[in-house]
Amino acid sequence: MNETEKSTHFGYQTVPTDQKTDKVKHVFESVAAKYDLMNDLMSLGIHRCWKDFAITQCRLRTGQRILDLAGGTGDLAKRISPLVGDEGEVVIADINAAMLNVGRRRLLDQGIFRNIQFIQADAEKLPFPNNFFDRIVIGFGLRNVTNQLAALQSMHRVIKPGGFVVILEFSKPTLAPLKAVYDAYSFQLLPRLGKLVAKDEESYRYLVESIRMHPDQEALLSKMTDAGFEDCDYHNLSGGIVAVHRGYKF
């Protein structure tokens, strides 16, 4: 659906564009306390390997300033923090205060705070100067953004020339047998697990539907190019269930 129109998708529902942000906010307020459990259920625990791979694609160095966008509970930031060191900086930005609060508590409990900042921010209108970050990484967050092109353009603006964005997101399986199994798990079992474990079947159903509505690998690549990124590429993980996209700013 054209993101400039007055309606957009919320899972499989069509909703007014100005309502999607609040609806997504409600979902993540509902699941914030059990977000990591949600990721385990949605990925059978493999999300840790996917995140590790995404971080390797960032090619991080000591002293860099990194934006962990839609950083929520800090699961990527805790991997980034030791790689940039005390001379570096990790900014965790998320539109949802409940997710940020969970992340702040968890990282403090793990003793990770020296080079971490938390900022509540909208991905479509990032409150940072031009050419500010060496890298931007966004994990499992882009599909929940109302206007993805606006968010990508905002990311492009705040990345330094020579820097790049890494996007880790659920995508489209490339193997037909895997797709059939994955669909059965996602639509039949996962919402029931959400109801049983998190007492929240509807939020889990939205999360599954949001994955199906997210652009496929090539469509996202094209959207990144439209936003100004160059030399864009992607890696399929787990047969395309997840893809890691990367795009440069020159």
UniProtKB/Swiss-Prot annotation:
Functional description taken from the UniProt entry: Methyltransferase required for the conversion of demethylmenaquinol (DMKH2) to menaquinol (MKH2) and the conversion of 2-polyprenyl-6-methoxy-1,4-benzoquinol (DDMQH2) to 2-polyprenyl-3-methyl-6-methoxy-1,4-benzoquinol (DMQH2).
GO biological process terms held by the UniProt record: aerobic respiration; menaquinone biosynthetic process; methylation
Reactions accelerated catalytically: a 2-demethylmenaquinol + S-adenosyl-L-methionine = a menaquinol + S-adenosyl-L-homocysteine + H(+); a 2-methoxy-6-(all-trans-polyprenyl)benzene-1,4-diol + S-adenosyl-L-methionine = a 5-methoxy-2-methyl-3-(all-trans-polyprenyl)benzene-1,4-diol + S-adenosyl-L-homocysteine + H(+)
GO MF annotations, alphabetized: 2-methoxy-6-polyprenyl-1,4-benzoquinol methyltransferase activity; demethylmenaquinone methyltransferase activity
PROSITE patterns with a match to the protein in the record: SAM_MT_UBIE, UBIE_1, UBIE_2
Species whose genome carries this gene: Coxiella burnetii (strain RSA 331 / Henzerling II)
Protein name: Ubiquinone/menaquinone biosynthesis C-methyltransferase UbiE
Entry EC no(s): 2.1.1.163, 2.1.1.201
Coiled coil (UniProt feature): none
UniProt-annotated binding residues for S-adenosyl-L-methionine: T73, D94, D122, A123
Keyword annotations from UniProtKB, A to Z: Menaquinone biosynthesis, Methyltransferase, S-adenosyl-L-methionine, Transferase, Ubiquinone biosynthesis
